[in-house]
């Protein structure tokens, strides 16, 4: 399935049906009086989070969504039928933005969440509504209210527990394939991964989700390479796993390149808990490994070592990540359970 994380959508709710001007016509009833019914309400436009989606690709093929108009009222006090609603189905993690792409309307994080993005117009009153003591036979009715037209943007930020970062060919996809059922494309050339991949990882009976983000390069924040387009997908993560290619000639420079791009991106991304791992240690001579370990340890602090191919040190890395994820989940639960303090 192709990946799309940004879509522009034009929506319109249904207009209300017009009221009816009608009079009761029956045998032997000379002055039947007004009996025009009200118009039906226009359909609403909803956005709903559903299970099983992880892309906005459906909105590439259809960008216009119109709810149905309400039916007009009829004689014999019959109200018109309401217009059918329309529902836009999106994956969890979708942000709904105004046309300026900056004003946030809603952040939809959980399956089942549903918001009304455009309310249908009200139906107009029939002439029965305008009958009074001084006007026994009104010949007026209200037209239905117009629907709402608006343009919105849908922006997907994948919901994962851990974000996987590194330069191209750092071994991110190999790590994801070795630890989960995900099958990302793996090859010996840069930018093998062009879109984010998700994988469910299990360790010691616990599971969490890792997002493999396409490789960053120096200047990504300025649009070089694939740019920093996909960094938004790790903003929701509890922790980041930064893989450094152990076979690189300058492991310190590679590490600092990614850190600089995180800081250039802005927000709280650079402040997130981060685990740094020297990858591909099975392809390095012991003496060279010791030198690179010492050099990288000076700038990265606590450094872990692993090999996605040989699976050396992988379990240890997963356990550290799991501890970070568990701590984040516990903090989220505690925040929900904490009662509001009583204030006089």
From Swiss-Prot:
Residues holding Mg(2+): 173, 193
UniProt keyword annotation of Cytoplasm present: yes
Domain Obg intervals: 1-159
Annotated ranges, domain OBG-type G: 160-326
Pfam families noted in UniProt: GTP1_OBG, MMR_HSR1
SUPFAM superfamilies: Obg GTP-binding protein N-terminal domain, P-loop containing nucleoside triphosphate hydrolases
Positions contributing to GTP binding: 166-173, 191-195, 212-215, 279-282, 307-309
Compartments it resides in: Cytoplasm
Cellular component terms per the entry's GO annotation: cytoplasm
Keyword set, alphabetical order: Cytoplasm, GTP-binding, Hydrolase, Magnesium, Metal-binding, Nucleotide-binding
Keyword set includes GTP-binding: yes
Class of the enzyme per the UniProt entry, highest EC level: hydrolase
EC code(s) of this entry: 3.6.5.-
GO process terms (BP): ribosome biogenesis
Cofactor(s), by name: Mg(2+)
Gene Ontology MF term list: GTP binding; GTPase activity; magnesium ion binding
InterPro entries, A to Z: G_OBG, GTP-bd, GTP-bd_Obg/CgtA, GTP1-OBG_CS, GTP1_OBG_dom, GTP1_OBG_dom_sf, OBG_GTPase, P-loop_NTPase
TM stretches of this protein: none
Assembly with partners or alone: Monomer.
Function: An essential GTPase which binds GTP, GDP and possibly (p)ppGpp with moderate affinity, with high nucleotide exchange rates and a fairly low GTP hydrolysis rate. Plays a role in control of the cell cycle, stress response, ribosome biogenesis and in those bacteria that undergo differentiation, in morphogenesis control.
Family: Belongs to the TRAFAC class OBG-HflX-like GTPase superfamily. OBG GTPase family.
HAMAP family reported in the protein's UniProt record: GTPase_Obg (MF_01454)
Protein's name in the database: GTPase Obg
Organism: Jannaschia sp. (strain CCS1)
Protein encoded by which gene: obg
């Amino acid at each position: 399935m192709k990946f799309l994380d940004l879509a522009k959508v034009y929506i319109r709710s249904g207009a209300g049906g017009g009221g009816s001007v009608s009079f009761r016509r029956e045998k032997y009833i000379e002055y039947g009086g007004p009996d025009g019914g009200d118009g039906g309400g226009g359909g609403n436009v909803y956005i709903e989070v559903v299970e099983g989606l992880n892309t906005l690709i459906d909105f590439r093929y259809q960008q216009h969504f119109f709810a149905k108009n309400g039916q007009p009222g009829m004689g014999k006090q019959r109200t018109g039928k309401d217009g059918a609603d329309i529902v836009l189905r999106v994956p969890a993690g979708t942000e709904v933005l105004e046309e300026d792409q900056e004003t946030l309307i809603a952040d939809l994080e959980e399956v089942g969440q549903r918001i009304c993005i455009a309310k249908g117009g009200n139906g107009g009153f029939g002439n029965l509504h305008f009958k009074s003591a001084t006007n026994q036979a009104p010949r007026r009715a209200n037209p239905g209210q117009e629907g709402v037209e608006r343009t919105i943007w849908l922006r997907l930020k994948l919901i994962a527990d851990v974000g996987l970062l590194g330069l191209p060919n750092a071994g991110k996809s190999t790590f994801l394939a070795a630890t989960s059922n995900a099958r990302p494309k793996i090859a010996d050339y840069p930018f093998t991964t062009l879109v984010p991949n998700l994988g469910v990882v299990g360790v010691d009976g616990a599971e969490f989700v890792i997002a493999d983000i396409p490789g960053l390069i120096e200047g990504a924040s300025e649009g070089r390479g694939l740019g920093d387009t996909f960094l938004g997908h790790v903003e929701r993560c509890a922790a980041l796993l930064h893989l450094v290619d152990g076979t690189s000639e300058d492991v310190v420079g590679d590490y600092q390149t990614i850190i600089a791009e995180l800081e250039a991106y802005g927000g709280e991304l650079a402040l997130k808990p981060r685990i740094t791992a020297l990858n591909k240690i099975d392809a390095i001579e012991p003496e060279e490994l010791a030198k690179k370990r010492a050099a990288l340890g000076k700038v990265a602090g606590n450094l872990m070592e692993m090999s996605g191919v040989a699976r050396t040190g992988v379990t240890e890395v997963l356990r550290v990540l799991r501890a970070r994820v568990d701590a984040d989940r516990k903090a989220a639960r505690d925040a929900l359970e904490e009662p509001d303090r009583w204030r006089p």
